[in-house]
Amino acid sequence: MIGILNRWRQFGRRYFWPHLLLGMVAASLGLPTSLNESQDIVSHPNSASSVSRQNSVSLSLTDLVALKEAHRRSSYSVDYWHQHAIRTVIRHLSFALTTPQTANAQQVDELQPHSLVLLDTLNALLTQDSQFPFVISPHAGRVTFYPQAHHQIGIWLAQIRGIRAGPYLLS
């Protein structure tokens, strides 16, 4: 019986918890924007909306967590458990993506850019504010704002790392 419990504990440590945390991070990347959109539903308790009590309780608990962290980081939009899951995934990835000391230089060069981009993007999720990207159009001379494009990869890269495609000025 003890052997079965030890095997189950080892299975959980090696496979279950890292994959669960990775799933939490992947599923919660869109969570802060959806919480901000649903705050007006929670603020009207007598409305005839289809929000259940469990959803309203979970939203108010995350609002409490956000209020707790508001005095530490006033412009930080990721709640505590999202931050904890991202940090744990960064820790797991940093150990998983490190190459052994006996590896060839060619293998190290192939692995290095991918692992650095992955860790840098997760670190940027922790340290940078979430802002919508602004596109400056050289033809119109005004700033255009795109609030609906939450899940487009180009907009996401422009938001997180300032990466954009094409030349800066058209000549």
UniProtKB/Swiss-Prot annotation:
This protein's record includes keyword Transmembrane: no
Keywords assigned: Cytoplasm, Periplasm, Signal
Ligase among keywords: no
Secretion signal span: 1-30
Residues spanning the membrane: none
GO cellular component terms, A-Z: cytosol; periplasmic space
Gene Ontology molecular function, alphabetical: translation regulator activity
Coiled coil: none
Major place of residence: cytoplasm
Source organism, top-level taxon: Bacteria
Cysteine pairs bridged by disulfides in the record: none
Function: Regulates secA expression by translational coupling of the secM secA operon. Translational pausing at a specific Pro residue 5 residues before the end of the protein may allow disruption of a mRNA repressor helix that normally suppresses secA translation initiation.
Family statement drawn from the similarity comment of this UniProt entry: Belongs to the SecM family.
Protein name as annotated: Secretion monitor
Lineage, uppermost ranks: Bacteria, Pseudomonadati, Pseudomonadota, Gammaproteobacteria, Enterobacterales
